[in-house]
Every structure is written in structure tokens, then in C-alpha cells.
Amino acid sequence: MTQISQLLKKAEAILFEKGLDQNAAEILLETRMGLSRSELWMEISRELEPNHEKQFEEDFARYLAGEPVQYILKTAPFYGYDFLVTEDVLIPRPETEELVACAEAFLKKHPVKNVLDVCTGSGIIAIALKKAFPEISVTASDISAPALVVARKNALLLNADVRFVETDLLEAFKQNEERFDMIVANPPYISEAEKAEMSDYVLKNEPSLALFAENDGLAIYERFVDNLKYVLNSSFWVGVEIGYTQGERVKQLFEKSYPHTTVVIHKDINSKDRYVTCSNILV
């Protein structure tokens, strides 16, 4: 049998040589063993059980072949929770947590009854908000049926009472004349021109339906903003994640359609434009 320290040393040398994330080996091993990072290091001189060693070898080979750690383990952290992720949904990004935090800050100050999360994917935004504010009604939508399967499983696993609807953006709610006080969205916003700058890990594994949009990445925003008037109450707050080059253009879309509202571009922790909010607060 092999010691944990020996296995990690060998794996990390391979990762270093290939220019890959050297934390990947530890993450794969600790997750499969059900240990925290500190617990793994306390056991560093221990010999691995054959089943754990075999599982690590299989996982490590998949990672070296280009599969993201989150898809291998089928889990990803977001906002203090562990979410199920599959190839049908995007891997949660830390930047999206900042949009959730902004929405939470608004919810703490203003009475809101109905919240809608558009392009929900794995359900991370809707579920995080429902866990923080169990008294509000939360609906989440996506055009992808496979993504909604994952989102429903996450809601069940995390005991979050969220309603899920399969629809193209706001169409179902527009047809049913439903109205919301708050709408959050993390839509596809990457342009085709940006593909050359993207990691192969993303391009080869994550669903393109959730990544790319036409018209320089703005096509989904244009349809979304144009139809908001059919589904918003008179007092509302809208927050959308954006690409770091899209702030002014998305702001202009909101200002053109809703000239008497407050539209703000917010920067992320790296000082890049990351989300835009549009609000009309009457209460």
C-alpha cells in the first residue's frame, strides 16, 4: 500500500509538469475519503486503503484527460453549501456569490414576496436565497430540462422549497401574467469571439447553451430586459451577472427601457464589472 504523502507528492509533480492546478490531487483525495483539508494532513503518513488508491488513480486520470474536478466529484461549493453538479450545468463561480450577497442585502431592507431566478442552471442562486429567506416565495427557471433535473435534486438535498419552471427566459411567466418583486439572472453572456481566450476545461466540458450568446454576448440580455415589463411589479429590484466588458452596454439597455429607475454597475472582488442592478423602490 502507498502512503498518502507519497501519492500526493507523485501526483503534484505530474500536475506541476503539466502546468495544472496542484491543489487538484488533494481535493480529489480528501473528498473521496470524506476528510477536510486539515484532517487529510493529519493522516498524511497513513497508508491508503486499496479502494481509495484505486479511486484516486481513476479520478486523477480523468483530471489529466481534461475533466474538471467538480464534474469528477459531482459536487461544487457555493455560498456555504455543497451543490450537485453534472455536465448539464455550469460549475459555480465565486463571482456569482457576490450577486447573491447583493440580492440578500436588498432583501434585508425591503419587503419582498416573490423572487424569480432566471437561467438557474443547478439552482444555486435560487436555493441560496431561499435558505437565507425561507419566508419568501422563490421560483427558478431554465430552458434546459436536464439542468432543471439537477436543480430539483439540489433543492431536495438542501431542503429548499423552490418552484422550478422550464421556459425560455420569461415566456411562461409572461403568458401566465405572473409578477415578481425581485428577479436575478446569470444568463449566457460570452461572445463567440472570446472562445480563443477560454480554458479548454470550460470549452470541452461545460454546456455551451449556458455560456454563449450572440450579438457580442448581449442577445439574451436584450430579450430579457425587453420583456421584464410584463413580469415585474411596480416596485422591483433586478440583478444580472455580466461579462467584465459589458457593464456600460447592459446598463444602457436597462436605462433605455426603464428611464426612471436606478441602474448601477457593480464591480467584483477583482475590481472588474461583474453585475448590474436596476431598481424602482416604492416601499
Curated annotation (Swiss-Prot):
Gene3D superfamilies with a match to the protein in the record: DNA helicase RuvA subunit, C-terminal domain, Vaccinia Virus protein VP39
Binding site for S-adenosyl-L-methionine: D142, N186
Gene field: prmC
Pfam families cross-referenced by the UniProt entry: MTS, PrmC_N
Organism for this UniProt entry: Listeria monocytogenes serovar 1/2a (strain ATCC BAA-679 / EGD-e)
SUPFAM superfamilies referenced in this protein's UniProt entry, alphabetically: S-adenosyl-L-methionine-dependent methyltransferases
Protein's recorded name: Release factor glutamine methyltransferase
Enzyme Commission number, as recorded: 2.1.1.297
Enzyme class: transferase
GO MF terms held by the record: nucleic acid binding; protein-(glutamine-N5) methyltransferase activity; protein-glutamine N-methyltransferase activity
Role played: Methylates the class 1 translation termination release factors RF1/PrfA and RF2/PrfB on the glutamine residue of the universally conserved GGQ motif.
Gene Ontology BP annotations: methylation; translational termination
Keyword Transferase found: yes
Keywords: Methyltransferase, S-adenosyl-L-methionine, Transferase
Catalysed conversion reaction: L-glutaminyl-[peptide chain release factor] + S-adenosyl-L-methionine = N(5)-methyl-L-glutaminyl-[peptide chain release factor] + S-adenosyl-L-homocysteine + H(+)
Binding sites annotated in the UniProt record for substrate: N186, P187, P188, Y189
UniProt entry tagged with the keyword Nucleotide-binding: no
InterPro entries noted in UniProt: DNA_methylase_N6_adenine_CS (IPR002052), HemK-like (IPR004556), N5-glutamine_MTase (IPR050320), PrmC_N (IPR040758), RF_methyltr_PrmC (IPR019874), SAM-dependent_MTases_sf (IPR029063), Small_mtfrase_dom (IPR007848)
Family membership noted in the UniProt record: Belongs to the protein N5-glutamine methyltransferase family. PrmC subfamily.
